[in-house]
């Protein structure tokens, strides 16, 4: 699986549609390839123009194939495209590479957008779960719950083929590319490559092809067991056996500390995990609550028996103070308190936060506020990233997003989910979607092909070919 550069998928749309009052105007065509020196010049120009901050940790790109509704290879990219809008909202890494602070995935219910995020979650959990196998910590158990890696079910061939993952990420030390191929929990292929940021030197660290394992470069002197389980990732084994190795630690710290997923489906547990004793987290939460113009001025947490907690909010209305139990608050406020600690921690630490159906948790006005907070480099000083799925179209506009921050997922008539970015769309004249276009309006009109009632006007036979 190769995903070194930004990928562009080609989708063919039927222009003259029967029983439809409008025509599809856009299709996805390959962009012009940006040469390395051209891209570097663009990145340096942006950095000089806006003086963007430098960060060290980043999710760069994720690719998956044959996972649940995803049959064919799809790539989700957090690398900024060379486009002109909102150039002050880009995260700049130490070697002038530019990354996105926010990405939203849109699409109909059942279209597969959650599966894109679940695929990433499944990969991270597959690596980390063995490291915490003996832990009795309830929070860790909740985070490390087993996620079943299932192949695409609507094709006889793919049902018997492995699922393929590829993850491209950065730490303060290096850029890593990790590949994992899994079939019925068994590891068929695994590889880890590294580029040291200080020298730019690229090297392979290990390669595993079924039972054959080769350790290279910084791992050349490490040893593996002849009885290594075929369901245990080699990366996990190295983390257990060589936890003090600098490179092993650097890689696994990213998996463990630099990316979080929020979709546990258990509100009480979620709240207990969210509420933090950190004064920095509380201070930032209160700042955000005030900026949202809510009348909560403070809150406190009481720990109860059986690992229960109660949260009390302090309100001031017309100079009158009152304290309420969080469970007496509106559902929106309760959802906000389950969410804001994760947001605050991500902003303070500069981590990647992945949330399924973020819009279901909060009001559209607050959703816009959170998106703009991550996009504001004065507030997002550590280079945190927010990735989420959404149905909310009120934020799908050029004020809130760059075109490369908007993604769509849609299913074809073979139930195969396709993932594509708004920046990839081109019309027949080779023109991109305008940066000042009304994205939400064009989406509803079917010009981006990710709405269920538009399936009949998309030539999915050609797409799925």
Question: Where do the model's predicted regions map?
Answer:
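Extended helical coiled-coil dimerization/tether regions that scaffold
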Residues: 55-57, 65, 263-328, 448, ...
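Electropositive, glycine-dotted interaction segments
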Residues: 175-301
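Phosphate-binding glycine-rich loops of NTP-binding sites
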Residues: 98-147, 336-337, 342, 373
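Pre-Walker A-like glycine/lysine-rich segment at the N-terminus of P-loop NTPase domains
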Residues: 47-125
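Short, positively charged and aromatic/hydrophobic N-terminal segments
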Residues: 11-32, 39-54
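Conserved amphipathic alpha-helical "coupling/scaffold" segments
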Residues: 158-175
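Conserved ABC ATPase signature
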Residues: 102-106, 308-344, 348, 352-365
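C-terminal lobe/lid and adjacent interdomain/linker elements of RecA-like ASCE P-loop ATPase modules
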Residues: 50-61, 372-465
């Amino acid at each position: 699986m190769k995903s070194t550069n930004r990928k562009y998928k080609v989708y063919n749309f039927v222009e003259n549609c029967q029983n439809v009052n409008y025509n599809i105007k856009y299709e996805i065509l390959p962009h012009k390839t940006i040469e390395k020196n051209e891209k570097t010049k663009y990145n340096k120009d942006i950095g000089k123009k806006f003086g963007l901050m430098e960060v060290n940790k980043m999710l760069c790109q994720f690719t998956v194939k044959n996972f649940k509704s995803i049959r064919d290879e799809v790539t989700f990219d957090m690398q900024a495209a060379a486009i002109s809008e909102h150039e002050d909202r880009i995260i700049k890494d130490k070697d002038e590479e530019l990354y996105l602070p926010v990405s939203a995935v849109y699409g109909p219910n059942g279209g597969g957008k959650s599966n894109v995020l679940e695929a990433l979650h499944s990969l991270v959990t597959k690596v980390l779960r063995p490291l915490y196998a003996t832990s009795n910590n309830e929070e860790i158990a909740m985070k490390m719950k087993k996620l079943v890696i299932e192949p695409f079910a609507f094709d006889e061939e793919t049902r018997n083929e492995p699922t393929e993952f590829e993850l491209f990420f950065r730490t303060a030390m290096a850029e890593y590319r990790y590949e994992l191929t899994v079939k019925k929990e068994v590891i068929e292929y695994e590889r880890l490559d590294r580029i040291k940021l200080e020298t730019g030197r690229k090297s392979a660290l290990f390669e595993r092809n079924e039972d054959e394992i080769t350790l290279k470069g910084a791992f050349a002197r490490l040893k593996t067991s002849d009885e290594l389980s075929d369901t245990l990732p080699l990366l996990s084994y190295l983390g257990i056996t060589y936890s003090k190795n600098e490179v092993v630690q650097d890689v696994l710290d990213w998996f463990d500390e630099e990316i979080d997923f929020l979709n546990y489906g258990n509100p009480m547990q979620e709240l207990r995990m969210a509420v933090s004793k950190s004064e920095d987290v509380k201070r930032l939460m209160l700042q955000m609550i005030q900026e949202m113009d809510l009348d909560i001025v403070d809150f406190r947490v009481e720990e109860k028996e059986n690992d229960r907690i109660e949260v009390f909010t302090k309100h001031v209305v017309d100079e009158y103070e009152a304290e309420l139990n969080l469970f007496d608050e509106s559902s929106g406020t309760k959802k906000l308190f389950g969410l804001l600690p994760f947001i605050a921690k991500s902003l303070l630490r500069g981590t990647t936060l992945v949330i399924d159906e973020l819009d279901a948790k909060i009001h559209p006005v607050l959703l816009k506020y959170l998106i703009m907070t991550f996009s504001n480099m004065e507030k997002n000083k550590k280079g945190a990233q927010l990735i989420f799925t959404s149905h909310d179209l009120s934020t799908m506009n050029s004020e809130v997003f760059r075109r490369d921050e908007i993604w769509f997922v849609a299913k074809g008539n073979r139930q195969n989910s396709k993932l594509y970015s708004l920046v990839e769309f081109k019309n027949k004249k080779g023109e991109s979607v305008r940066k000042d276009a009304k994205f939400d309006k064009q989406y509803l009109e079917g010009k981006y092909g990710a709405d269920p009632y538009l399936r009949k006007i998309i030539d999915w036979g050609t797409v799925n070919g």
